[in-house]
Amino acid sequence: MLVPFISKPVHIDDAAYVAIAKHIAKDPADYYGLSLNWDGVARPVYEWHASPPFVKFYLAFIGTLFGWKEWVLHTAFLLPAILASAATFLLAKRLCKRPFVALAATLCTPAFIISGTSLMLDTWLLAYFMLAMALWVEGFARGSIRYLFCAAICAGLALWTKYFGIALIPLLTVYALLKSDRPKYWWVLLLVPTAMLIAEQAYSYFTYRHFLFTNVAHVVMDERISDRTVYTWLLIGLSFAGGCTFSVMQLGGVLWNGRLRLLGTLLWLAMSFLLVWLTSRDNVTLTAGFKLPTVSIFVYAVLLLGGSQLFSLTYSELRHRADPESWLLALWIAGTFFFACYVTWSVNVRSLLPLVPAVAMLAARRLDFIEVVNPKKTNRRIVTILSVSAIVSLLIARADMEWAQSQREAAYRYGDFAKSHHGTVYFQGHWGFQHYMHEAGVAQFDAKTTVLQPGDVVICPRNNANVRPIPRDYTAARAHDQFSIAHR
């Protein structure tokens, strides 16, 4: 499903990853030694970038060997998607009787498809996360120390990909304690990912006199919106979780009996409408200063219903089974959700991606013990539901690709303008727009060092990131073009 998007332009944070990868191709030992303007001022990457370098090294390897064309890089990123899919299926075979349903419910989500079309770290994290989980569970099932050792290595590679990989250590520990009858000395293996994290941090400190792990805390403290309440973050998190696991939300008609479906739908829709209405009265916490239209409130309520279903599934699982696998999935979902809502700097699909396979497996496990009167009819319903979810997810991914294309087209248009303009043309903004403006040879505006002269132009995209207002005391303050990057 990702193949149609291999020509997708560089988008969102892809631009930073590609820029760092090109630097690594020239100087791999000093991987974060370049300066990059990502918030309006050029700063060394090691001062602000909040993730380990593994994915950038992978991009550098691919770009050096095969070139930096978008289709080359996106083709290379099919590998982590394949690994994540294989690991999800391997784990689902151990945890449920319908592994193909769990796999399809994972793949047919907007979270998986959109993340799979990016050049960022999230699909690689999911691949190593799922490999670590699958090999750890398989190792205990077989009593194999080799599987457990490979799981520990994958956990370390997850940590080298994104620091969220540290969540694997407590999850694997809890599962091992619940399965503590065999094999022995498993705890020694969990020192492997810990040692890999320490080694990565030690190298960054000796190279830059700076622990990269501390950047995570700085980003959260500097960027997180502080005037939102715990309740508001919960609403946002539930709505995002519902959208990320759209396939499982659609399966609700199969997973619950008629009375529960009716009762749950009425209850959660009523609560959702009430909560969204109350929250929409506060123009700061949820709506960013604008009033939500009725249609948006309805969609928001549906997403809240889907997000709430995750915890209904978790409760049902623990009530009926409460085996080590149930606790593993429950803690996996709860921990990821808490991290995405209350730890990371903003609630986003990328942070919630790791819980998608766990939710899909919970849904498949529920199908294992519910009474099915007509199995063939139920299977047809499941196939239909997952097909609809796949179509919706592909349409969302297509819209995201069109947004990326619009940024590239705008950059090329303003690049042509810069070549014919007599003064100097600068630009603000980041993401893919920044990448293609650099390709077009347009200078980036730096709030600290740029001095504007009469006749200069500053291009300011209104719906981009970190676009700073031009001070009125600048000579050329009135000679700037503000525009919105949007679909045609």
Tell what function each PLM region has:
Residues T88-P110, L126-A127, R142, R146, ...:
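Transmembrane-helix signature of polytopic, membrane-embedded enzymes
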Residues N379-V457, R462:
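Membrane-embedded, lumen/periplasm-facing catalytic core of multi-pass transferases
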Residues H11, T117-L125, N348:
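Short acidic/glycine- and proline-prone juxtamembrane loop motifs at membrane-interface regions
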Residues P53-A60, L65-A86, S115, L119, ...:
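Loop-to-helix entry region of an early transmembrane alpha helix in multi-pass inner-membrane enzymes
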Residues L191-T194, I198, R261-F273, P293-T336, ...:
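Signature aromatic-anchored transmembrane alpha helix within multi-pass, membrane-resident enzymes
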Residues T75-P99, L131, L135:
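Transmembrane-helix motifs of polytopic, lipid-linked glycan transferases
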Residues K93-C96, A132-L148, A158, S180, ...:
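Membrane-interface transmembrane helices that cradle and orient dolichyl/undecaprenyl
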Residues Y185-T285, V392-Q405:
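Membrane-lumen/periplasm interface segments of specific transmembrane helices
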